[in-house]
Amino acid sequence: MSCPTSAGVLQTHQLLNDNSILIRDEIYGEELVSEPVLVELLQSAEVQRLQGICQHGVTGFLGITPRVTRLEHSVGAFILVRRVGAALDEQVAALLHDISHTTLSHVIDHALSKPGEGSYHEVHKARYLKTTRLPDIVAKHGISQKVFEEELFPLVEMPSPQLCADRLDYALRDAVSFGKLAMEDAQKVVSSLRAFPSATTARRLLVLDDAEVALTLSRAYTTTDKDVWSNPAHIDMYERTGRVIGELVEAGSVEDKVLWQVSDAEFWTMLRQAANPEQRRAIERLETEGVPEDDGLELPHCAKIRTLDPDVWPRGEKQPAPLSIVLPTWGTERQQYILSRTQHR
C-alpha cells in the first residue's frame, strides 16, 4: 500500500495494491477503483501529467486562484458518471475527456488558436493521441476508440446550459474552491444527481431530483462565472500571457510539442529562459502585479458567458424539465445575467 498522493486541491489517490486505487475527494467522498482498464489509465503517464496542469492557467499557476488541477477535475467527472451507473466505456470517456489539454490550459487558446477555431486542445486532440499509449491501453482492455470522442457520451458532455459530468464537476470543484458554494450544498447536489431515464439508454441525461438544490447550484455557477471564468481582469492575464507564448512559438524559441510534455511550472521556466528582455518584463509583470484593476476592462467578444439550466426530475414525475421551466423566476434571472454580461462587451 502506497501513501496517498495529491491530485489537486480537493482530491488524493492511493494505490492499495497493483489492482486497486482509492480516490478520496472532499466533495464526493471515497471511490474504490479496481477495473483493470481504469487502474491502468489512472497510473499512466498521460493521465498523471494532468496533475501538473492548473484548470485556471496562469491565475492558478501564480496562486491568484486555487490550484485546481486537470487531474482532479477529470477524475471528478469520472466519479460522477460512475455514481449514476454509467457503463464502463462512458466512465473511461469521462476520465479521458480532458486528456489533450496543454500546459496552462486555456491560456494556449489566446496564444495559438486561430479566429473562429475551437479550443486548442480539442483541435489538436488527434495529433496528441498519436503520441501516446492511450489508444493501445483502451484497445488492450476491449474498449472502443470512441471513448476519445466524449461528445458521443451524453452523461459526459452536453451542450450548455444543460448538465453533464464535465460541466458539473468543474462547477462544484471551482465554486467550492473559490468560496462561492458551501461544501454541504455541493454534497447535496451530488446526492440529488440521477440519470434519466437510466444511465445506459441512448437518450440519457444527467438530472437533479430537487429544484431548490438545482437553483443553489445554478446561482453559484453564475457567481463563479462573473467573478472568475468571465472576469475581464483574469481574461486580460490570459491574453497577456498568450501573447508572449504566441511570439515565442512563432519565433521557434519554444516548440509547440512541449505543450503536452511539461507541467505548468516547467513550461513557465522555459518561457523565462526563451524570452527576450521585453517578453521577460511582461512575464515579471504578470508575476508581481497580479490581477489588474478591472475598471474599464471590457469582456472580450470571444469570452464565454456561462450559465446553467439543469434538467430537474422530481421523484414521482414522468419527465424531467429545465429548471427555468420548473422555476420560471430562474429563467428570468438567468436571462438578466446574460444581458448584463453582454452589455460589458
Swiss-Prot record:
Record keywords, A-Z: Hydrolase, Lipid droplet
Protein's pathway: Secondary metabolite biosynthesis
Record domain HD: where: 70-171
Main location: other
Induction: Expression strongly increases by addition of L-alanine that activates cordycepin production, as well as during the development of fruiting bodies. Expression is positively regulated by the two key transcription factors Kruppel-like factor 4 (Klf4) and retinoid X receptor alpha (Rxra).
CDD domains, A to Z: HDc
E.C. code: 3.1.3.-
Effects seen without this gene: Impairs the production of cordycepin.
GO biological process: dGTP catabolic process
Pfam families on file: HD (PF01966)
InterPro entries listed in its UniProt record: dGTPase-like, HD/PDEase_dom, HD_domain
Catalytic EC class: hydrolase
GO molecular function, a single term: dGTPase activity
Quaternary assembly: Interacts with cns1.
Main function: Metal-dependent phosphohydrolase; part of the gene cluster that mediates the biosynthesis of cordycepin (COR) and pentostatin (PTN), two adenosine analogs with related bioactivity profiles as both mimic adenosine and can inhibit some of the processes that are adenosine dependent. Within the pathway, cns2 catalyzes dephosphorylation of 3'-AMP to produce 2'-carbonyl-3'-deoxyadenosine (2'-C-3'-dA). The first step of cordycepin biosynthesis involves hydroxyl phosphorylation of the 3'-OH position on adenosine to produce adenosine-3'-monophosphate (3'-AMP), catalyzed by kinase activity of cns3.
Note: Cordycepin and pentostatin biosynthesis coupling is an important point of metabolic regulation where pentostatin safeguards cordycepin from deamination by inhibiting adenosine deaminase (ADA) activity. ADA is not inhibited until cordycepin reaches self-toxic levels, at which point ADA derepression occurs allowing for detoxification of cordycepin to 3'-deoxyinosine.
This protein's name: Metal-dependent phosphohydrolase cns2
